[in-house]
Amino acid sequence: MESISMMGSPKSLETFLPNGINGIKDARQVTVGVIGSGDFAKSLTIRLIRCGYHVVIGSRNPKFASEFFPHVVDVTHHEDALTKTNIIFVAIHREHYTSLWDLRHLLVGKILIDVSNNMRVNQYPESNAEYLASLFPDSLIVKGFNVISAWALQLGPKDASRQVYICSNNIQARQQVIELARQLNFIPVDLGSLSSAKEIENLPLRLFTLWRGPVVVAISLATFFFLYSFVRDVIHPYARNQQSDFYKIPIEIVNKTLPIVAITLLSLVYLAGLLAAAYQLYYGTKYRRFPPWLDTWLQCRKQLGLLSFFFAVVHVAYSLCLPMRRSERYLFLNMAYQQVHANIENAWNEEEVWRIEMYISFGIMSLGLLSLLAVTSIPSVSNALNWREFSFIQSTLGYVALLITTFHVLIYGWKRAFAEEYYRFYTPPNFVLALVLPSIVILGKMILLLPCISRKLKRIKKGWEKSQFLDEGMGGAVPHLSPERVTVM
């Protein structure tokens, strides 16, 4: 929500919100209280002073605490601090809330901003802010600023996330704290009533929630394909010819694993969308919820795509290092000696030359498109695009990237997919396995692009239902569907 500032006259120092509520006045005339003298309280005080506020600190030991604050800060006892301001940051832990119980008569009608966090997710039945509200029912409790670290407060919002989540049961208090966040150069996000406080308190405690599944999938795929390549390229020569190729493990085997994992993860990104489309076509509606596993899969597509990009970049780095290996130099010298010994003047192979040229070219194009997909997934970049632009890049160009990557693998395999010597231990080559999932995804996309299917899918996305068509044909009424059941693809 934007505020309207009276900047026409130097005497107009008040800020008015669109709903007519008086916002915070000029920062130089506002005193803000902070209860607590810890690291967060110190950083918050410095931030408030830089933005022109006068700060009063309430501490149990003001004489000792004053040594850690600037001299312009008024460090005093809790009781004295509470009488000097109407906006108070409660920068103490939950277990110390009761220390303010005897001073509750001084907190009547005042705004208490709870900035505390817990040690683990859902540690208590109710949020800290709701617990604070139960202790001081006559105060206006606001939850906010808990997602900002003390380090970010000191450095300023340019070096950290600028979003601050704020909620309160009192609209007027919430709007004042929102305006305060704007004055501190943060971006406030209004989450409504105090019932959202528990979700806000859980946000800083979550560790890559959406990344766990994709990372497990990536590690599992990497482990499987690494062992698969190890058995085929190291164990097989040793078992058959007593040839020791264990030197290939650090570079060559790893480099064979990386591209397979990259293209498989990229295929999983778009396979989820195909399954979702097939699900909607099967049931003839978009109002039926996806199964939990598919819903989770759809939410993790960004993480799968970024992991695919990571494996592709590492694959390029490994490939560039291949000629630098000592083993590669020895192999090159051996090939040169054998050519001289066989009296071969020209070893030019037109087919191999074209194959490698196209192979590298398609690889570069694939990496370029993956880089574009990765860059547009950055929030600041995606926010600058409208929905059609973002969808075109992530969907249309994404499928183009998958198609070019598939060509890259096909050209790498070339005729070797039909050569018997490449089926060691009766297992197909690595590149054959890498082509299975991308081929399924590309074939599935081609089926969805057929006019008879794409038209039906577009109608479903616009709200058409199979049951509605049947009911209309029979002259029946369509039952009302709650908007809560709507699942957008």
Curated annotation (Swiss-Prot):
Record-listed FAD binding positions: 151, 159, 280, 301, 377, 394
Membrane association type: Multi-pass membrane protein
This protein's encoding gene: Steap2
Spans traversing the lipid bilayer: 207-227, 258-278, 304-324, 358-378, 392-412, 431-451
Family: Belongs to the STEAP family.
Positions that bind Fe(3+): 228, 318
Binding residues annotated for heme b, in chain numbering: 315, 408
Source organism of the structure: Mus musculus (Mouse)
Single GO term (MF): cupric reductase (NADH) activity
Positions of modified residues (Phosphoserine): 482
The name this protein goes by in its record: Metalloreductase STEAP2
Reactions accelerated catalytically: 2 Fe(2+) + NADP(+) + H(+) = 2 Fe(3+) + NADPH; 2 Cu(+) + NADP(+) + H(+) = 2 Cu(2+) + NADPH
